[in-house]
Amino acid sequence: AYDPVIAVGAMDWSFRPAYYTDYGPWVDIAAPGGDRYSGKTTRTASDGRTVFYSNAQILSTILCDDAIAYQDGRKDGGMYGYGFMQGTSMACPHVSGVAALGLAYAAQNGKKYTPAEFKALLLSSVYGIDDCFTGSKDGELGPIADMAVYKNKMGGGCIDALKLLFAVKGTPAVYVRTGEPVTVDFARYFGGDRSRVAQTAASFASPGNLGLSSSKAVFDGMKITFDCPEPGTSMLRISAVSGDTEFVREFAVVSRAGLAANGGWL
């Protein structure tokens, strides 16, 4: 790919490469592009035809002119003017949209970046998907026998808007697996000698977002043990003291059903 641009690969709903996507070491990042062969169901038009726009693709606005007799059911019922589509033309806008969101958030927080700095920030705001490249899947020209051929060829992972916003703000994000107990030592985020850091107060801003109750979070010094029954996000505010210096820091605790080896989420 032309080096100054960002090359985007397309993935399906199961985090695997879409059958049509290009791939290779030059791909920078992946994003949802849809894949009609990975859909579990299709939509049926009023005349009984199975329409092209299945729910394994990306919901998009589409041309809808009453003077044109379309053959794909796009004027049926509540779908008027909308359709499920697929392609890198769907994947690329995900990345450009997240980039625009990040730049707007940076302006709101008084942050400025050079193009190279923001590109690096954007491309590092991903979650790993290579572990999903297993088995086979259907494609336009027949089954794709071995999904492992895509490994290390779909960029650093799938674009993660939440991770980009945390990076812009400078908020540390702690990712945990939904439904599994975890103990996190937050002392390392306060610098210096960990043994001298003592917690004075800690609280989740929105514990309900994670399915947490007061009895499900155990605070032991700077270590917090908790189990998030629900996927979601909550800010965690910790007050601590090291010697005669007091600190207050906020963390984003993100609960996801699956975690990638690189610390991202699936």
Question: What is each stretch, according to the model?
Answer:
Residues 168-198, 263-264:
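Solvent-exposed, low-complexity, repeat-rich "mucin-like" stalks and linkers
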Residues 191-222, 250:
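Surface-exposed or secretory-pathway low-complexity segments enriched in glycine-proline
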Residues 1-9, 16-34, 97, 120-124, ...:
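Mature extracellular/periplasmic domains of secretome proteins
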Residues 257-266:
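Low-complexity, Pro/Ser/Thr- and charge-rich linker/hinge segments at domain boundaries
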Residues 244-258:
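C-terminal edge beta-strand
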Residues 221-235:
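Extracellular/luminal low-complexity segments enriched in Ser/Thr/Pro
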Residues 34-150:
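Hydrolase catalytic cores
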